[in-house]
Each structure stands twice: as C-alpha cells, then as structure tokens.
Amino acid sequence: MATASPAADGGRGRPWEGGLVSWPPAPPLTLPWTWMGPSWGQHPGHWGFPALTDPSASPAASLGIFEVRRVLDASGCSMLAPLQTGAARFSSYLLSRARKVLGSHLLSPCGVPELCSISTRKLAAHGFGAAMAAMVPFPPQRYHYFLVLDFEATCDKPQIHPQEIIEFPILKLNGRTMEIESTFHMYVQPVVHPQLTPFCTELTGIIQAMVDGQPSLQQVLERVDEWMAKEGLLDPNVKSIFVTCGDWDLKVMLPGQCHYLGLPVADYFKQWINLKKAYSFAMGCWPKNGLLDMNKGLSLQHIGRPHSGIDDCKNIANIMKTLAYRGFIFKQTSKPF
C-alpha cells in the first residue's frame, strides 16, 4: 500500500486518488468555508503551518499555542481578526502577525501547529469564538454521505453454513461535517439456523430473545430501502457510498445470503469503501486486527463492545472522522460487480 507524498505530487496530495492532501490550496481560497487541517510539514506527523516551523529551533525557543495566543492578544493582534477580515486567509494572517510579534521566537511542531489539531469544540471552549468553532474542519470529500455498515451473523466453531445476518446497522455520516445524521438498526431472524449458538452469543453479545420474532432478511432489506428513500439517499443528485471494515460484509455475506434465499441485491450495496484499505493508504500500514489496530494507530478509545454491529459502526465513523480531519480523501475501493 502506498501513501500520497509531497514529492510525488508537487507538495500536494491528489484528492481523487485518496490520500493525505495539502489544504488549503494556493490563495485565493474560493470555497465557502475554511480548512484549518493538515498541510505538509517538514517531518512526518507535523500538521499545519509548516512555514512557522524551523527545524533548527531549540525546544527552549518554542512557544505553545496558549503562549502564542497570550503574546498576540497582548500586542492587540486578536486571533479572531481573520474571521472578520477573511477567514480563508487565517493561516497567512497568523503567520505574518506571529512573526512580527514574536520576533526571534521560533515555533516548533508542538507550538502553533497544535492549533490545527485542536477540535472546533475545544477552540470554542478556549475562547476562540463561536464563529471559528462553526467552521468545517475537513477537506471536501467526493461523497455527500457515507453509509457505515457492519453486519453480525450466525457463527460457530467449526463454522456453520450458510451464515445468516442477525444484526443490520447503518450510520448515515455527513461527508462535509463527518457527523452522524441518522441511524438504521434492526435485528434479523435467522431461518436456516434459528437457534443461536453459545459461541455466537459470546462473540456478538446477541442473545436469542433479540432475534426471535424479528423480521426476515427480506423484510429488513425492504425497510432499508424505505429508510434510504426517506433520508434522500436514492436521489440521483446525492452521492453516497457504503463503508465497511473489510470486504466481507458486502462482497461475501450479503450477496451470499441473498443468493441462497433468491433475493436481489440492490445496486447501492454493490460499491463500498473498505476502511482497512483506506487506513493503509493514509497511515502506510495494514491494520491486521481491524478496528483495534486502527483505533490504536490513531490514539482513539474503542467505543462499546467489540463485535457489536452498531458499536463497530460507531468506531468506523470515529476513525473516518479522524482520518478526514487529517486530510484524507475517501474513495471507492470495491471493484464493480
């Protein structure tokens, strides 16, 4: 797996290929919102304001984010001024003012770049104002919505055949804000092996009472279609794509069970993003242990119970949000059926 590199593309990633990108582009910035996320720095892991970084600067000569703010405020250079005069030029404004005010103080990656990694909620909490907190801290994605999906299915040791979906969760993730806007979540009654095995219950946390009397897969698929229509996801002008942790859910499990039951597979299930591949493009390593490795690699806390479909979806969404904040542009990884 390869990552986008500054040298390979003139210092900028290519959003249509998926990878880390340098943002914003050269001024003037024409988008209606301001991206304060990553730009290529002078060493791996450096996010934002590379021009403020001098690799020869000693730690003693470095100023942290709050020291920078204090010095700027004391000099009458409000860090909110760019919001009133053109937020798109925020970084260049801060660069010029910081250089004038701070003089010989050189800023290290633990200084001003910290401004870029702080969340918009924290910006508001630290007094940077609601206007800054409201800015969207992500580069534009190729899709309006990401549909995060993670099935749980009947299982045992040795494996039973055919496996049947017993939990069907979907999170609708806004591609601009990377926030969850809607949730579809249903349990499914298995019909070939209606009795869950102890192994299955221990692995997934799903007990027999949670699937007894629930709709069949055919009925659940009909409700998924109704939900998709209600959420505006079937509009041809709305671009959406499913996201899974691996290819199993939509390449193996759903088409396999639908084939067994003689059910059609909707076209929207035939393209997806494999988060493992996206993560490997962004981070340069393959997550052998799936969500656990991805959360660890991004210093994220695992949400909920492993192998709970809905909790796994929340973890996927959180990982996607973190990668997007770092400048990753998601693209389809599945091949056409």
Swiss-Prot record:
Cofactor(s) named in the record: Mg(2+)
Tissue specificity statement from the Swiss-Prot or TrEMBL entry: Highly expressed in the brain, heart, thyroid and testis. Expressed at low levels in the muscle cells, liver, pancreas and kidney.
CDD domains named among the record's database cross-references: ERI-1_3'hExo_like (cd06133)
GO CC terms, sorted: plasma membrane
Positions with a binding annotation for Mg(2+) 2: 150, 249
Complexes and interactors: Interacts with PRNP.
Listed name of the protein: ERI1 exoribonuclease 3
Gene source species: Mus musculus
Taxonomic path: Eukaryota, Metazoa, Chordata, Craniata, Vertebrata
Gene designation: Eri3
